[in-house]
């Protein structure tokens, strides 16, 4: 917007205010202010018109019109439209097929040419390399047998990728996200669990950055779970009770903040890659201690055993799979530049007036700054804009504050983890700010979340709790006026009583089953299953849900839901109020409100019901289940409705034939899930 005001166009005699301020604002000033506002709106509209000429910057409503100009249907996405011309110029090439699959689904893809993976007689005129055998048992590549990158050539099959006249797009239906410098949890005898919540989490190999028009050529280009076969197939390995990678092994390369596999620091000093060994780190009796200058990494459990030569305080950078933008690992919240008071929590920084080392100190400092500044008035607070912002600029485990119970001067507070950081609150967080609205965004929470009666509102965004340990959201029975909402969270059970406002959930998993991943031979973690939503003491709360998966029975006073999955059913007290639309409501004949296009069968089939699995309560895309198209917009129901996984996969199946040569059959397959 231009910095010129309408008042600048007037003569100074009319524009300048009188020496003595009038008792009431001048009519001329009000008129000029209104003109400036309308001119600003007009300038913004003109700017948007120019932005709508380009697919990268246009508004959402303009995408179908630009798609029509390049011959795509109205439901094409922004990335598909942007790459349409470039992809068409490269039709018929394996790289174009891979790029098409990635654009439509967002997943890593591998183009498999059937004639390259099947047995057939080679003529002298065929280009090298010679096809002398089905598989070379002396090659390191033999360790890839049974994987998408297997070197073996198979007999021809009528269908599937092993047919010379087939071109297959092989997809990995998950993405990797990185935990950077996350503080590990000690489990005794210099052993640590890498995950911020102390649960087992297998390690994955981060794909190499890919240039335009390149191919997924090896296991270094795919988001694979790191196993011993992967270690062997990629480079030299020294065998023994604890494996050691050769000095030229590709998994030892890379920058510390973006390693292919893992990077560690001990006491803020980097652990050299040559110190890493790979073996078992069980959770029971301590195994033999490693040498003083060695660190044993357990790939299957996500644990490390540190030698005596390294200092305490282990931090790790590693990668985990996700199916959607849920939980703290998917948080990408920007700092709000309009916050009136900002306090940063950073354990490694020098404390100052606006930088502290604990959450408790940040809350105290923020309130003190509010009290000391007379220009900060509660009546100037704006909806949607925090008055106080506490930024957790660390990936460490922070001690929880003592129960926070006071009447703040300013009503809107926000506790947020900036993008790329994954801080953990190491215990129960109890909040009771009188009359305040609190937003908690992008953090891991190891304890319960206790909400007091004085709060006016609480908004949870990209929060991850530990349902395996039975952690829950506990709302005070006296919180009659609390407005509780959650978006894109992984929550434990919710316990609240009937209040003036319902609980609002969007794109969340509410897990009352509490199952966890377990290493080979380890007991399955998790306690007894419990209700996902239920009363705290007296009457169950009201519920409004959009795109939520409830694992466990749901009890509510009233329920209004769309595109949800109630794994164990939903029961309401007042069935005449509310409606369930496009949901799976469970097979049990429980009292529930009016339903519209809801399903009671078949039972949902999930990739995994275990917390921290890559397909955690994600519907299995390889099965032909009606829930994949049961949503109000034709997509899948449940917590991953926002990811549009099934829609992208179906769109690829419709368009893939355009990008293979005439006479070839196009197929779409998915790599097997690494965690169940």
Outline where the language-model segments fall.
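Compositionally biased, low-complexity/repeat regions
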Residues: 1-340
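Surface beta-loop-beta hairpin patches that serve as ligand-binding interfaces in beta-rich domains
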Residues: 310-328, 596-676
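Short, glycine/acidic-rich beta->alpha junctions
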Residues: 89-93, 103, 354, 358, ...
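Acidic glycine-/aspartate-rich tracts in secreted/extracellular proteins
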Residues: 310, 395-398, 588-590
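Feature marks extracellular polysaccharide-active and adherence modules
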Residues: 344-346, 393-395, 416-418, 426, ...
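Predominantly extracellular beta-rich ligand-binding scaffolds that present long acidic/polar faces
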Residues: 497, 503-610
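N-terminal extracellular ligand-recognition/capping segment immediately after the signal peptide
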Residues: 81, 348-429, 444-449
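Detector for repetitive beta-architecture
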Residues: 387-389, 395, 403, 412-414, ...
């Amino acid at each position: 917007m231009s910095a010129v005001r309408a008042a600048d166009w007037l003569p100074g005699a009319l524009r300048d205010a009188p020496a003595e301020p009038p008792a009431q604002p001048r009519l001329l000033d009000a008129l000029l202010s209104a003109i400036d506002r309308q001119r600003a709106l007009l300038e913004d509209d003109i700017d948007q018109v120019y932005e709508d000429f380009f697919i990268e910057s246009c508004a959402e409503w303009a995408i179908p019109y630009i798609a029509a100009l390049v011959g795509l249907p109205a439901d094409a996405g922004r990335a598909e439209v942007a790459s349409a011309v470039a992809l068409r110029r490269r039709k018929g090439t394996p790289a174009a097929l891979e790029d098409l699959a990635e654009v439509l689904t967002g997943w890593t893809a591998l183009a498999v040419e059937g004639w390259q993976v099947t047995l057939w007689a080679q003529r002298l005129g065929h280009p090298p390399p010679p096809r002398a055998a089905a598989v070379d048992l002396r090659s390191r590549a033999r360790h890839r047998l049974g994987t998408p990158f297997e070197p073996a050539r198979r007999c021809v099959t009528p269908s599937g990728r092993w047919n010379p006249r087939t071109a297959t797009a092989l997809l990995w239906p998950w993405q990797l996200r990185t935990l950077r410098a996350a503080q590990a949890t000690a489990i005794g005898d210099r052993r640590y669990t890498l995950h911020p919540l102390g649960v087992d989490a297998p390690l994955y190999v981060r794909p190499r950055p890919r240039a335009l028009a390149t191919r997924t050529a090896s296991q270094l280009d795919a988001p694979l779970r790191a196993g011993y076969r992967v270690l062997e197939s990629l480079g030299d390995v020294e065998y023994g009770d604890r494996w050691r990678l050769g000095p030229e092994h590709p998994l030892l390369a890379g920058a510390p903040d973006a390693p292919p596999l893992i990077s560690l620091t001990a006491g803020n000093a980097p652990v050299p890659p040559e110190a890493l060994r790979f073996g078992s780190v069980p959770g029971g009796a301590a195994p033999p201690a490693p040498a003083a200058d060695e660190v044993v990494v357990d790939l299957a459990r996500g644990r490390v055993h540190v030698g005596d030569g390294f200092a305490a305080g282990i931090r790790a950078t590693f990668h985990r799979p996700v199916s959607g933008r849920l939980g703290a690992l998917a948080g990408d919240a920007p700092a709000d530049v309009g916050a009136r008071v900002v306090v940063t929590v950073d354990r490694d920084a020098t404390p100052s007036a606006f930088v502290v080392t604990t959450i408790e100190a940040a809350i105290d400092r923020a309130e003190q700054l509010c009290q000391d500044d007379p220009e900060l008035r509660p009546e100037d607070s704006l909806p949607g804009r925090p008055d106080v912002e506490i930024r957790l600029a660390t990936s460490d485990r922070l001690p929880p504050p003592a129960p926070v119970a006071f009447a703040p001067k300013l009503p809107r507070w926000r506790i947020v983890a900036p993008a790329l950081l994954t801080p953990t609150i190491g215990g129960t967080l109890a909040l009771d700010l009188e009359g305040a609205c609190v937003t908690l965004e992008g953090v891991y929470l190891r304890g319960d979340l206790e909400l007091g009666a004085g709060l006016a509102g609480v908004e949870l965004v990209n929060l991850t709790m530990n349902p395996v340990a039975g952690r829950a959201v506990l709302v005070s029975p006296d919180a009659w006026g609390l407005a509780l909402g959650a978006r894109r969270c992984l929550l434990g059970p919710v316990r609240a009583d009937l209040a003036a406002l319902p609980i609002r959930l969007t794109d969340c998993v509410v897990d009352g089953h509490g199952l966890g991943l377990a290493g080979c031979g380890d007991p399955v973690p998790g306690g007894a299953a419990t209700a996902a939503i239920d009363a705290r003491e007296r009457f169950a709360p009201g519920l409004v849900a959009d795109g939520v998966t409830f694992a466990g029975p749901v009890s509510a006073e009233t329920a209004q839901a769309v595109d949800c999955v109630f794994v164990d059913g939903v029961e309401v007290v007042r069935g005449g109020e509310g409606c369930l639309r496009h949901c799976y409501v469970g097979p049990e004949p429980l009292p529930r409100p009016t339903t519209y296009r809801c399903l009671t069968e078949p039972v949902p089939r999930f990739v995994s019901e275990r917390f921290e699995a890559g397909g955690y309560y994600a519907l299995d895309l390889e099965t032909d289940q009606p829930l994949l198209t049961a949503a109000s917009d034709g997509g899948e129901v449940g917590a991953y409705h926002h990811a549009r996984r099934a829609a992208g996969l179906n769109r690829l199946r419709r368009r893939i034939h355009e990008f293979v040569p005439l006479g070839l059959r196009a197929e779409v397959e998915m790599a097997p899930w690494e965690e169940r």
